[in-house]
Amino acid sequence: PINKIAKSVTIVSDGFANFYNQQFHGAGVGIPVFSIRTRNSFGVGDFADIPMLVDWAAKVGLKLIQFLPLNDTNGTHTIADVLPYAAISAFGLNPLFLCLPKMGKLSDDNELMKQYAEKQAALNASPLVEFMDIIGYKYAYANALYYQEKENFLNDPDYIKYFEENKYWLVSYAAFCALRDQFGTSDYNKWGDYAVYNQG
């Protein structure tokens, strides 16, 4: 009731919110992608392992899947980069979760390709996540694949479309990563003249 003299409102409530019964209710699972390790993984779960989790969740009647952040956390190229909430980009995904075979195959004479099966078996057998070994190999693999395939993918219509749709963040993200690697830190305050991004 409204007290007209004191111009105040008194609210009486039992403390319970009443919702319509039609609201969605569902059980789910929260999981970091690196925990979805399969025999096809490379020491950690990756993006290609997610469909199997989705199939399992549907089979057991779960309605929701929540992942720990998937964003790039590689700010120092050290073990500190393992923290999922220390993202350096709101858009860039963490290379830790790359599925190397889905990216493309290196030539058979490439040293990384020769090591792949043995390295994969060792990393998958480890009871721990060998973060530095995994991310180091994945960066090296991606870099080698880039130089092997750059003429092909730079002219690929799917790549061109992706770049055009995402260049609003992709160019500045690539510049950030290049400067991070050049200066050895993601702290842009230590980049001297490059501390302020200039789109021009």
Set out the residue ranges of the language-model regions.
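Short beta-strand elements
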Residues: 2-18
